[in-house]
């Protein structure tokens, strides 16, 4: 079953309080890797749009904007029940990107081909094509396996 982006964000928040921007980037990276590895681990309302600060999910932005502080605590005390595949993607994303700074994650996301295509052709606030995300992250996976 597809999860809400807030469920994914809440999972990352179990590790530590995270800035709004870093949380958006982690969720974008989760979405891309989930699409590449197994479409069943994707997101409800999983559309990310271009912004000056990289890809953002509008429903997550609305939720995050309800917090005055930039660093967000856990949303809920209890985590959603994740499947083994979802945990695999969540843990892989956290172990790969969790220690990186907000600035580094934003740079990684902005430099991703799906973001670049949407931003260069359509500008700000344009949806990033999920199929292009899937293909891009599948190619990244192949590059990692070969290298």
Task: Tell where the protein language model's regions lie, with residue ranges.
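Domain-edge interaction signal
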Residues: 1-147
């Amino acid at each position: 079953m597809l999860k809400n982006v807030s469920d994914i964000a809440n999972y990352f928040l179990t590790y530590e309080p995270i800035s709004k921007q870093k949380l958006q980037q982690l969720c974008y990276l989760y979405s891309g890797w989930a699409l590449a590895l197994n479409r069943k681990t994707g997101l409800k309302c999983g559309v990310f749009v271009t912004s000056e600060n990289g890809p953002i999910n509008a429903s997550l932005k609305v939720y995050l904007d309800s917090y005055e502080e930039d660093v967000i605590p856990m949303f809920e005390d209890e985590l959603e029940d994740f499947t083994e595949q979802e945990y695999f993607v969540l843990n892989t994303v956290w172990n790969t990107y969790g220690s990186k700074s907000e600035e580094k994650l934003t740079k990684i996301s902005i430099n991703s081909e799906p973001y670049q295509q949407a931003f260069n052709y359509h500008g700000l606030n344009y949806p990033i094509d999920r199929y292009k995300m899937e293909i891009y992250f599948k190619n990244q996976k192949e590059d990692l396996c070969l290298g």
